[in-house]
Amino acid sequence: MSNASQLQIPNAKLDPRGWLNAAAEDQGFLVVGIGPASIGSVYKDGLSTFLDNAFEGDMDWLRTTASKRMQPQNMWPDAKSAIVLGMNYGPDHNPMDNLSARTAGNISVYARGRDYHDVLKGKLKQLASQFSAKTGNAVKVFVDTAPLMEKPLAQQAGLGWQGKHTNLIDKDSGSFFFLGELYTDLPLPLDEEQTDHCGDCSRCMAA
């Protein structure tokens, strides 16, 4: 996906924000942000503390892939920017209403449709191809299958903040969205990192 086509535009003339927003919306993404390819120290420290306390339980892969999670550029040293995208999967009704039916099973909202890995990967690949055609730069696609700390990356890109229920929260759309990433070797203007707005609130945990 790194080969430029006849549509190539010089990098200096590319409006990454305007073009990315429009292209991402065309692919069905609700939000898009640009952050650094690296992980901030506060998130690295959080993972270290998590592992030091053996909170991973039987999830051994969290420990064996820790170095890549803390430094994503170990997987691609040329990476300069992380384009993080979110796709809404929220239902058109309150899913909590289903819990009132005590004798019926309840399937988590995210699992009621097609496998989101397949859906997002296909759309991200199309977006990556367009990006490479416009910039001539290389792009790599990630959808929850590589050892990336997606929620910290999303917070750094301004998409939201990680709530006490561990999911990413966006002020406008809540937590009902899947995350995907485009890593590129093109340095892009970064969005402002989102801050934690939870305070003393714990409604997500009570739910």
Regions found by a protein language model. Give the residues of each.
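Auxiliary alpha/beta "docking" domains used to position bulky ligands
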Residues: 1-197
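Cysteine-centered iron-sulfur cluster-binding motifs in ferredoxin-type domains/subunits
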Residues: 193-207
